[in-house]
Amino acid sequence: MSKQKVIICHSINENLADAISQCTYDKLFILVDEHTRKLCIPLIQEAGFMKDAQLICIGAEDVHKNLDTLAYVWKQLGDRGATRHSLLVNLGGGMVTDLGGFAASTFKRGIKYINVPTTLLAMVDASVGGKTGINFNGLKNEIGVFSPAESVLIDSEFLKSLDLHNLLSGYAEMLKHLSLIHI
């Protein structure tokens, strides 16, 4: 398994552009859900890499972390000419980074991907470590692989759009990690 670069930044445009430039690719795709399309794409819209990027938008919430949505992402990649040398940027919470990472890891036997988590929970858990997957047959993360992203970019700017529930979910995950240190 390759090493994963985790970058904590405060300038998402510059750092994402740098992470993208470090990857060799022929086509660039950005996976978002309905929420991140509305709230987060405006933060990177003016970046130079966006002129070449193709956006793939999926439904928000964990109910969409399933085989149908995965097949939709694969179909979008295929229909838009993605190759084994394409790059997928997953911009969103844990559902987007899990599903997008799994889609990238299995499309054409694996294409490179970058995770840009936009929720605190995804920043401290889902997007880091190479866990990818989908829910199946009523079970959470039932199908998946370990396949680390080329880079994970964590920018606190995205936290400004979160409601209290999403912040508390992230804090709870942080406390869980902290409690494991003392076992």
Predicted segments, located by residue:
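ATP/NTP phosphate-donor binding region
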Residues: M1-L87, K176
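Acidic-aromatic/histidine active-site loop/patch
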Residues: G94
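A glycine/threonine-rich phosphate-anchoring loop and its flanking beta-alpha core
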Residues: F102-I181
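Short, basic, helix/turn surface patches
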Residues: G81-V89, K140-F146
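Catalytic nucleophile loop
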Residues: T97
